[in-house]
Design a protein with these regions (language model features):
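Short clusters of small/polar residues that mark proteolytic maturation junctions
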Residues: 42-43, 132
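Acidic surface patches and DE-rich sequence motifs
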Residues: 32
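Active-site-adjacent loop/helix segments that line or gate small-molecule/cofactor pockets in enzymes
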Residues: 1-29, 43, 67
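Short acidic-aromatic active-site loops that bind/stabilize oxyanions
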Residues: 74-79, 170
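Glycine-rich phosphate-binding segment of PLP-dependent enzymes
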Residues: 38, 44-45, 49-76, 84-104
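PLP-dependent aspartate aminotransferase-fold enzymes
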Residues: 87-174
């Protein structure tokens, strides 16, 4: 364990001895460095939970890594895995002509959605339409836009000015 890692939502001065060091996973279980097992019911917040140690996924990832592990898709580049994932998402969506913006996390997705919504209004000439509605107790990530969008007040505190133009409604108000 290291003090070099800043854990989200943890007190900065939290002692290293208070952390549970997860060292491996199998199926729906993860194990700490003492051998104790835990049900991984979080899906880890940062990725889609598909269970740990699945050999078919490990083999597919290893095969892809042998060809090319990754490459950016900034204009003018693309790559076959990114194209394939985008097509799979559009095929499963209700929008046959849909387009996909690939990101790395839910936090990044929230920030990008805010940007796209505001850009759409700018392009329509409706520059005054900048308000984003958030719900009380809604969690939308740790990035700047997601922190601004979330309805958990303590998570928005201590950062200075956040992204403006959010209004909050009760979580159960349709």
């Amino acid at each position: 364990m290291t003090n070099a890692l800043l854990h989200p939502f943890a007190p900065v001065a939290k002692p290293m001895s208070d952390y549970i060091n997860i060292v491996r996973g199998s199926g729906s279980l993860v194990y700490d460095d003492t051998g104790k097992d835990y049900v991984d019911g979080l899906g880890s917040l940062w990725y889609c939970q598909v269970a740990h140690g699945r050999t078919e996924i490990i083999d597919a990832v290893a095969d892809q890594m042998r060809r090319i592990e990754a490459y950016n898709i900034f204009d003018p580049f693309t790559n076959e895995p990114a194209d394939r994932v985008a097509e799979m998402i559009v095929e499963r969506s209700p929008f046959p002509d849909g387009r996909v913006f690939l990101g790395c996390s839910g936090s990044e997705a929230v920030d990008t959605a805010i940007k796209i919504a505001r850009q759409a209004m700018q392009r329509r000439g409706q520059t005054e339409r900048q308000v984003v509605v958030r719900r009380t107790n809604g969690y939308h990530g740790t990035n700047f836009g997601g922190t601004s969008a979330q309805g958990i007040a303590p998570n928005r505190e201590g950062w200075g000015d956040l992204v403006p133009h959010f209004v909050e409604v009760p979580h159960d108000d349709l």
